[in-house]
From Swiss-Prot:
Descriptive protein name: LL-diaminopimelate aminotransferase
A single GO BP: lysine biosynthetic process via diaminopimelate
Signal sequence, start to end: none
Gene this chain is encoded by: dapL
Residues that, per the record, bind pyridoxal 5'-phosphate: 72, 108-109, 132, 186, 217, 245-247, 256, 291
Length: 409
């Protein structure tokens, strides 16, 4: 008989953001016409930059003409985009990444979730807590964890991120093989310094481990001393894979374009302990299971690197950062401790003793504001909420005014 994958039965009942959507829908059904301001899921609200829209149109026009029509493209991405990425995102910052080390995809979520397929199921993973749920859930699906008990899965090295360590995880005390890091961080909005990141790179060399570095929010960094890429750190090319996305950088959440960097110098180890290159493994997986991002979308992504595109993308991110500042200042005024909102579009807020879901429900029902309960990101997120800056200035200001009234501040 056909049997299901038993590891799916270990997963908690549903994905965090599905739970949020259900609660919001139930509230709207019982309160028809209520005005909801969504500051929960990290989805952008402003239109694509004009430079990207124009390039998108040109790409579509090419597809409408037999002479310029394109069918299947290279699975790894068109050279015109890969070369721009290598030049503008890496070489310009002193990171020696070549275009053929870049794999264009339809999302960092897919890539961070899929990359674990390259590794043995008996490796030990190190996951920050709180963390973006996809990292952990995909490893549960693959069978790398034990059962879920007392808020955590067995067989996982959880790296607590709390106020005590400024929400930057400490190095593991035990041997781990695969390490997930995300900076600027989702959900806490915190950043990591170059010396802190260097310690992780050194650890990975010593432990023969691999770092999966999610840099989806690097476009929001304004402090020039902070690393935008792990490859700004000496030795990282041998022990790290990096994930980037145009979703938050240029508003591509509904357009879908991202990329993963797998340096040819990066090594993993076979069952006999011999070092082997990781690049051809991901190339094989990528080309077997993915047929490439559409040509017009890649042309739109290329436009991000034009003179006009750079200015428009920066203005877009600056607007969201201004929103984050409004949120953080408002929460400070209301007496809540918070981090993030600087070099990041997320603000991580201590609920002053409130349960995460209780705080979520209070803001939804009394203020009509949707946030994200911190407990959905892990055990260490209990008592916190995440508020996203991805909305219009007007709605963010309205949301803060409503919250102030609802909380009696």
């Amino acid at each position: 008989m056909i049997r299901s994958n038993p590891h799916y039965e270990k997963l908690r009942s549903s994905y965090l953001f599905s739970d949020i959507a259900k609660r919001v829908a139930a509230h709207q059904e019982s309160h028809p016409g209520v005005d909801i301001i969504r500051l929960g899921i990290g989805d952008v609200t402003h239109a694509l930059p004009d430079a990207c829209v124009a390039a998108f149109h040109r790409g579509v026009d090419e597809m409408a003409n037999d002479a310029t029509f394109r069918g299947y493209g290279p699975e790894q991405g068109y050279a015109f985009l890969r070369e721009k990425i290598a030049s503008e995102d890496f070489k310009a910052r002193g990171a020696d990444i070549d275009s053929d080390e870049i794999f264009v995809s339809d999302g960092a979520k897919c890539d961070t979730g899929n990359f674990q397929e390259l590794f043995s199921t008996d490796i030990r993973i190190a996951i920050p807590d709180p963390v973006y749920p996809v990292y952990l859930d995909t490893n549960v699906m693959a069978g790398r964890t034990g059962e879920f008990k007392d808020g955590r899965y067995g067989g996982v090295s959880y790296m607590d991120c709390t106020a005590e360590n400024n929400f930057v995880p400490d190095l593991p005390q035990e041997q781990v093989d695969l390490i997930y890091l995300c900076f600027p961080n989702n959900p806490t909005g915190t950043t990591i310094t170059k010396p802190e990141l260097k310690r992780w790179v050194d650890y990975a060399h010593e432990a023969k481990a691999l770092i999966l570095f999610d840099a989806a929010y690097e476009a929001f960094i304004r402090d020039d001393t902070l690393p935008r890429s792990i490859y700004e750190i000496e030795g990282a090319k041998e022990v790290a894979v990096e994930f980037r996305s145009f979703s938050k950088t240029a508003g591509f959440t509904g357009t879908r374009c991202a990329y993963t960097v797998v340096p040819k110098a990066c090594r993993v180890f076979d069952q006999k302990g011999a070092a082997i290159a990781l690049h051809p493994l991901w190339n094989r997986r990528h080309t077997t299971k993915f047929n490439g991002v559409s040509y017009p979308v890649q042309r739109a992504a290329e436009a991000v690197y034009s003179t006009e595109g750079k200015a428009q993308v920066k203005a877009l991110a600056d607007g969201y950062l201004d929103n984050a500042g409004i949120i953080r200042r408002a929460m400070d005024t209301m007496g809540f401790d918070c981090v993030g909102g600087i070099d990041s579009p997320y603000v991580w807020i201590n609920g002053n003793g409130r349960d995460s879901w209780a705080f979520f429900d209070l803001l939804l029902k009394k203020a009509g504001v949707v946030c994200t309960p911190g407990t959905g990101f892990g055990q260490c997120g209990e008592g916190y909420i995440r508020i996203s800056a991805f909305n219009s200035r007007e709605k963010v200001e309205t949301a803060m005014a409503r919250m102030k009234e609802a909380l009696g501040s």
